[in-house]
Amino acid sequence: MANSASLLYDQLKVAEPFFLLAGPNVIESEEHVLRMAKSIKDISTKLGLPLVFKSSFDKANRTSSKSFRGPGMAEGLKILEKVKVAFDLPIVTDVHESSQCEAVGKVADIIQIPAFLCRQTDLLVAAAQSGKIINIKKGQFCGHSVMRNSAEKVRLAGNPNVMVCERGTMFGYNDLIVDPRNLEWMREADCPVVADITHSLQQPAGKKLDGGGVASGGLRELIPCIARTAVAVGVDGIFMEVHDDPLNAPVDGPTQWPLRHLEELLEELIAIASVTKGKQQFQIDLTPYRD
């Protein structure tokens, strides 16, 4: 199990031009997830991009207690296992409690640590002990240096297979911005750097609802902008949530990318990545210039 994780990790580290973590935000039904997995795999295979399929079994930090959360861990893992077998795809999904890591590690190839929990040592250690690849999302409240420490917690628990993910920084109330400097600085964690190009455009609890209450909004129209920036900088991986009907998605509809435009966007990103030197350190010569 640990060997298969290391093999996948080694493949993702050298993926060119980048690897892709993609899928619908949450498991809505078995039929929907299987259909989405097939569609996304068909596109990624056509474009030659290594794909890890993503979907969550439980959205534990919804804005409202009345919001849809997903099928739960037991049922959700059964569905993700079917995706894995049916389409020969590695799986990434998130955990929220240390007690979930063992069961999730039996299905997922990558265990994702949510941004709000990126400093939780017990959770990081429990996830690391699964032997699977660990993808740590940078908290919206954190500087880039926190990711170096979080990655080190995973390594000290005996697991060298770790990645860090930029997903935006709080900018006042109910808004996030993406600081592209973090995509460079997070390399100090000495591991692959992933850019979450969808959640990073979320507007947390920024949408007022008719009849009172709030929900999270988002700036879907800026997803291409953030994606172009990320691949130009030279990230190792792109994380994005994709939906075939985003206006009716039960979770994070405003920041899910339409499936019908996925191939078009990825083609553009591949073209940008093919000409950038972002993965190479720019060597600056500060000696006095002479003609």
UniProtKB/Swiss-Prot annotation:
Molecular-function GO terms, alphabetical: 3-deoxy-8-phosphooctulonate synthase activity
Which GO terms of the cellular component aspect does the record hold? Answer: cytoplasm
Instruction: Give the enzyme class.
Output: transferase
Gene Ontology BP annotations? monosaccharide biosynthetic process; pollen tube development; pollen tube growth; rhamnogalacturonan II biosynthetic process
Residue numbers carrying N-acetylalanine: 2
The record's account of tissue expression is:
Expressed in roots, apical meristem, emerging leaves, hydathodes of young leaves, styles of mature flowers and funicules of mature siliques.
Q: What is its main location?
A: cytoplasm
Pfam families, A to Z: DAHP_synth_1
Compartment(s) of residence: Cytoplasm
Q: What is its EC number?
A: 2.5.1.55
- Reaction(s) catalyzed by this protein? D-arabinose 5-phosphate + phosphoenolpyruvate + H2O = 3-deoxy-alpha-D-manno-2-octulosonate-8-phosphate + phosphate
Keyword annotations: Acetylation, Cell wall biogenesis/degradation, Cytoplasm, Transferase
Protein family (similarity comment): Belongs to the KdsA family.
The record's annotation in PANTHER family points to: PHOSPHO-2-DEHYDRO-3-DEOXYHEPTONATE ALDOLASE (PTHR21057)
Q: What does this protein do?
A: Catalyzes the stereospecific condensation of D-arabinose 5-phosphate and phosphoenolpyruvate to form 3-deoxy-D-manno-octulosonate 8-phosphate (KDO-8-phosphate) and inorganic phosphate. Involved in the biosynthesis of 3-deoxy-D-manno-octulosonate (KDO) which is an indispensable component of rhamnogalacturonan II (RG-II), a structurally complex pectic polysaccharide of the primary cell wall. RG-II is essential for the cell wall integrity of rapidly growing tissues and pollen tube growth and elongation.
Q: Which HAMAP family match?
A: KDO8P_synth
Q: Write the protein's name.
A: 2-dehydro-3-deoxyphosphooctonate aldolase 2
The species is: Arabidopsis thaliana (Mouse-ear cress)
Identify the taxonomic lineage of the organism of origin.
Answer: Eukaryota, Viridiplantae, Streptophyta, Embryophyta, Tracheophyta
- Gene from which this protein is expressed: KDSA2
